[in-house]
Amino acid sequence: MSNNPPYMTNGIQAAVVEWIRALDLEIISLLLSRAWPLALLTTTELRWRPTVLTDTDNVVRLDRRQRLVRWDRRPPNEIFLEGFVPIVTREDPDWEETDLYGFAKNNHPSIFVSTTKTQRNKKKYVWTPRNANRGIVYQYEIYAPGGVDVNDSFSDASPWPNQMEVAFPGGIQNIYIRSARELHNGRVQRIWINPNFLDPGDLEPIVSSSRTLQVIWRVNHPDGGNKDGRSERSTSSYDDLMYGGTGNVQEDTFGDESNNPKPIADGEFMIESIKDKNSFLDLSKNVNGGIIHSNVYSGGDNQIWVFSYDDNKKAYKIKSYQNSSLYLSWDSNASSKEIILRGYTNSGSNNQYWQIEQTGKNYRLRNLLNLNMIITAQDKSSAFGGKEVIVNTEISNSNTKSSQEWNIIPFDFRPIMDGDYNIFNLDLPNQVVDFSNQPDLLVHGHEFCDNENQTWHFTYNSTYHAYKIWSGRKSNLLLTWDSNATSKEMVVRAYTESRSKNQYWRIEQTGSKSYKLRNLENSNMILGLTNVSTSYGGLNLMVQDDSNGNSNLHSDWDIKPIIYQYVPDGDYNIFNDNFPNIAVDYTNQEGALVHGHNFCSNNNQKWSFVYDGKKKAYKIKSGVNSKLWLTWDSNASSKEMVLRAYTESGNWNQYWRLYQANDGSYIIRNLKEFKMLIALTNIDTPYGGKQLIVTDTKESGNHWYLKKLGEVPLPNRKFRIATKLNYKKVIDSSTAYNLIITHDLNFASSIWELVYDSNKKAYNIYSADINNLGWVYQNKNFFVKLDNIDGPDHGDLRYFWTIEYSMQTGCYLIRSLYDPAHAVGYTDKDSVITDTSTYSDNQLFHFILM
């Protein structure tokens, strides 16, 4: 396997599991590579799907435009809401659950979600499970970034090459799922459209049949929960529909018809000009006879249209969302023979009906009264600020025919679920929307400090199709545009509920983690930060009209769900990132001081994390004395803010919050003061360790890894154990039964069998070549010996070893259970010995499955 860094890829961007999506790509790559099959190490490597790829039809596309399919028995009410969540989601998956080859071959429970590429060769083909025609099955259509290309990764050894699998570590978010076909016993019943889909543009239309109902999904849709008993899934069941051994490639003939009169579903849409990007059909005035033109995007109701298909007329009526009594109409009876569009009340005339014709990826809208007349965008300015739109006969000139082509975009009113969020500015990444309860009720931007001032509770109103955003500081106050303010500065305040539209916000998704917030009172008004400071120490937050595209506000936001319970309650070791062999330690010394100490696997270094749902923080209890809690001595007179183990006081300085970094480590902050975090210094303590402090400065030792105690990192299987620096060098035994490092010559003597003892929570490491022989610890700087470990003294701790995975390196450290301060390593002369653990390269190993 090569050591090349990951190339240009979107990697794990699609992941629905937060902790996986937050990892650096190199870290997740190491996590997946640790279980790579030995036989494939020299010929294959992990291959992420590149950002720009050559599709199965030899067309170069972005990964977001490659059509993927997933077969699943779960309905849209689950998948469109939650996305595809893998069976294994916990933060400490075991070896087997990250085994890509095992997953691809057997689809066992794992952190992966499987998809298959659409295969194109003049016609369209899709890998299809043989039981897809039994019961209720869904074929989901996916356009997602990143993922691992299984065939590219395993080459000729790919278990099921005809499946053309793309596997997604951490699953797939709902915003990357465009549609679903619902099949009952093999027959398509309806097509579900996902309004939350983040369209990358330039996609082929959703393939449909004129006889198939298309439905735009909504939360708890009454028809969106259809499933049969085979859809039930547990952590012990297999992902049966995507198992590569039970399917084959079939031609996808659904929707093959030359003229489909119903190419889109009924629902709410925006109609974008292909000629003038970001210009949409717009009802200029909310009156009967109001002119319809094209105008730049505003997010307003006047640019949203409700499509309803008439089966008798084989055409659509299109009414304004702003005023449901006004229909998109061509006034064909006007004495002036006008050809402009207007919004008229229902007349029953065919000039209010439109046939929609697919033109590749786009659409034409033909008037039913005269099908030669097509809606056409003009260059001429309208009197209302946009450009005129008329009906005209078909244009054949290839340079100008785009004026008759339109993109019909489903409108999504609800891109996020109700809940608590921080609102981070993307241009000023540490600035968030903040309400500090000041006398003028002003809301501003402030440096993130994770308190209730910066918590906002979003609640969706289905009548207004907009959100109310409630203050976490004062739950009766709403984020409000003070639209009646006399000041020219359009400020934002926190007011009690008035039922005014200026307290509602439409959320417009502009990227995978990017949103704009538009006020419902005037959808041209967007929320943004200026660079001007306020008297309260933050930045001015205001709304500004962006209808001319010239807003100078920082108006792009990342609306982040607030997560505090990152790890389950339980016992952990707390290892430092910079000093990987040092753990947080309390040895009951004078002054109850807590420090960092070389790992020795005793109760001094065991800490029980207990989550408090009210305070949304952890208490961390000592493993050596259950009455003592990890405490910041915030009242200490010393300038050095030390950590101590004190009895319970109820004070906030005994509560801690975790903040996950991209590499899987955590920052541990004190609840009493957000800026204060635990850091390890390089200063020695009188007790043989390193000093731990609580500080608000950027110490280098402030990242920590949590190792949950009692978990089994590797299965009871046979392995070769290769060095970190060279996987072709493995642990073997000499004729004197001492362990040595040697080149991998495929000898049976270099195969080792792990047998886990659940009582001792440690392994025996047996020779797979000679019965009863296993590893024996002798002492520091002595050989690891191969000897009989199945005799009367089988329980001797010298025969047992703990194995821990290093997230930083993607390798394993092997410790003696007899003396956990000692780890297996090797010398310059390739002797395998035990020495004080340091996490140095010569103490790190790969376990390669046989």
Curated annotation (Swiss-Prot):
Residues 267-409, 413-560, 564-707 form the Ricin B-type lectin domain. Keywords: Apoptosis, Glycosyltransferase, NAD, Nucleotidyltransferase, Repeat, Transferase. InterPro entries: Pierisin-like_dom, Ricin_B-like_lectins, Ricin_B_lectin. Transmembrane segments: none annotated. It comes from the Eukaryota. Gene3D superfamilies: 2.80.10.50, Heat-Labile Enterotoxin, subunit A (3.90.210.10). It is an enzyme of class 2 (transferase). PROSITE patterns: RICIN_B_LECTIN (PS50231). The keyword NAD applies. One of its GO terms (biological process) is apoptotic process. SUPFAM superfamilies: ADP-ribosylation (SSF56399), Ricin B-like lectins (SSF50370). Its EC number is 2.4.2.-. One of its GO terms (molecular function) is nucleotidyltransferase activity. It catalyses: a 2'-deoxyguanosine in DNA + NAD(+) = an N(2)-(ADP-L-ribosyl)-2'-deoxyguanosine in DNA + nicotinamide + H(+). Belongs to the pierisin ADP-ribosyltransferase family. ADP-ribosylates double-stranded DNA by targeting the N2 amino group of dG residues. Induces apoptosis in a range of human cell lines. May play a role in destroying cells during pupation and/or defense against parasites. This is Pierisin. The lineage of its organism: Eukaryota, Metazoa, Ecdysozoa, Arthropoda, Hexapoda.
